[in-house]
Amino acid sequence: MTEKDESVKSNSEYTEEQEVKNEDTSTVENVEDTTSDSDNSSNDSSNEESSEETAVDPKDEEIQQLQLKANENEEKYLRLYAEFENYKRRIQKENETNKTYQSQRVLTDILPTIDNIERALQIEGDDESFKSLQKGVQMVHESLLRALKDNGLEEIESEGQAFDPNFHQAVVQDDNPDFKSGDITQELQKGYKLKDRVLRPSMVKVNQ
């Protein structure tokens, strides 16, 4: 083989090597481009998913607002209902109290009349007409007390009882060995109460 032929062969081999290198380089670049495209596509998908997670559905937001409004309205309703029930109970109690004590003023005004009748009954006389009159007054007195009792009027027990400032008014002190200290020895004026409410305390004499 001549030097010329060897030179041609050598150039041909060099050309083939260059083509192989170029092909390898092109393949690497294509792989890199493919990888880059894949990464970009993955990033885009990830960004889209993140954006979808972050975004709030307007319908869900509207439902939340409606739920909050419903809760507020329920609280207002429960508050108003409780206030109304308390008002009803208060009015009912006031009506019951008024019904129970509606005769208080009338009964209080009648007490002096009862006192006068009882004083009249203490007067003594031998005349038959007087006794007949006194008997009539006695009947009126008993009838009146019976009617008042039916309307809730009660006498306050005093004589022989321990003094109680809630029901008795001490006007005189006594020194009676037959009674304990603080006991009522004599009732000077009757006291009355309407159920559990005192209309007038008893005026009494209290032992020292």
UniProtKB/Swiss-Prot annotation:
SUPFAM superfamilies linked to this entry: Coiled-coil domain of nucleotide exchange factor GrpE (SSF58014), Head domain of nucleotide exchange factor GrpE (SSF51064)
GO CC term (a single one): cytoplasm
Repressor is among the record's keywords: no
Similarity comment: family membership: Belongs to the GrpE family.
Molecular-function annotations in GO: adenyl-nucleotide exchange factor activity; protein homodimerization activity; protein-folding chaperone binding; unfolded protein binding
Source species: Staphylococcus haemolyticus (strain JCSC1435)
Swiss-Prot/TrEMBL GO biological process terms: protein folding
The protein, known as: Protein GrpE
